[in-house]
Every structure is written in structure tokens, then in C-alpha cells.
Amino acid sequence: KIPIYYDGNHAYNESKFFTMPNEKMDLKEYLNEIYADGGGDDPESGLEALAMAMKSDFVQKGEKKRHIIILFTDAAAHPFEDYDKLTAEAARKGYKPTIYPENMPKDIYELYNVWEGNTEDFSKEVTTLDKTGRRLVLFAPNEYPWADMGIDLSSTIRYDLSAIKSVDDIAEVMEFLYHAI
């Protein structure tokens, strides 16, 4: 499943789950349709994207479950605590997101607790993340909150985007993940 976040009126969209390896080409086609637009107005909505991914309806069957979230961002994230201020600012600029997820964590610590399995839910929604099969892969800069997440959260790998110089570097990382997971 691919959640996608943008600024402005169309803040959120998501794909269906892709079953690997059977739907590999469908996933590739979907990824080719995603584009980056605008930018330069850090921070962005990366934490919301991560929270939505964590609330996905992950498969619960099978002996070896892997619930893998891969997040790409080139910017710091808005703190959850700034939500009210940000929505008021967006309204002043004439933006009213047509789709914005409900029940976001109240702060970063609530998100951390759900990831670590210390609580079954945030905002009264149950997560189906497998406590031993969850994996978080971050392609993110050395900015809030990504640098800390790479250290603080279990089963998490972070790659600094400034160290990635080409598509070949990402392909190498993905090949490593494919064999490691």
C-alpha cells in the first residue's frame, strides 16, 4: 500500500495493497504515476503519512509476516502538536484539504508507543502491525523527526537522502532490503 501526501487541497491518497511478487509490475506502474510538485516550504506532512501507513490493514496470515513501511521524504515534518495552528494557517491561505486523515496521534510519543507495541491504538483505532514483523525504512534527511527515529525506534533503518547520489544508490538499498527482509 502506498500512502501519498501533498500540500494543499488534495492532501492524501493511498493505493491498494500490492501482493509481491505477483503484482510487482502493477506496483511499478503505480509508482511511476507518483510525482513531486511544489516544495521548498518545509516542513511537510511526513508524520501523518507514517501514522496512516501504521494504521493500514496489514495481512495477518502466514508464518512469517513482514509489515514493511518505506517512507521517502526530503523535508522535516510538522509536529503533530502544531495541527491546530497549521489548519488555521491553511484556511487563511484558502486551503481546505478535501481528504485529511482523522485520528492522528496527539504527539510524537504516541506514535512511538504504537510502533513499539506499547499500546494497541492511537486515537481509538487499532493497528494491525505485527510486533515482531514490523519494519520501518526511512529515506529522509537529518531533520526532525527522522534522525531521531532512526535511532529511537526498533526495527527501523534510516538512509540520509544527502548520501544518496543516484537512482543506483536507491536500487542498491532496495536490493539489500529485499534479501534482508
PLM feature segments, named:
Residues 25, 62-68, 95-96, 129-136, ...:
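Loop/turn elements at helix/coil->beta-strand transitions in domains of secreted/extracellular proteins
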Residues 1-4, 67-74, 137-140:
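Extended hydrophobic secondary-structure segments that form protein cores and membrane-embedded regions
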Residues 45, 141-144, 165:
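Short beta->alpha linker loops
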Residues 38-42, 114-117, 162:
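Short amphipathic alpha-helical molecular recognition features
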Residues 75-152:
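VWA/integrin I-like adhesion module and closely mimicked acidic/polar interface patches used
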Residues 26-30, 49, 89, 107, ...:
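Alpha-helical scaffold elements adjacent to nucleotide-binding pockets in ATP/GTP-utilizing enzyme cores
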Residues 7-68, 76-78:
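Von Willebrand factor
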Residues 151-181:
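C-terminal "exit" segments of structured domains
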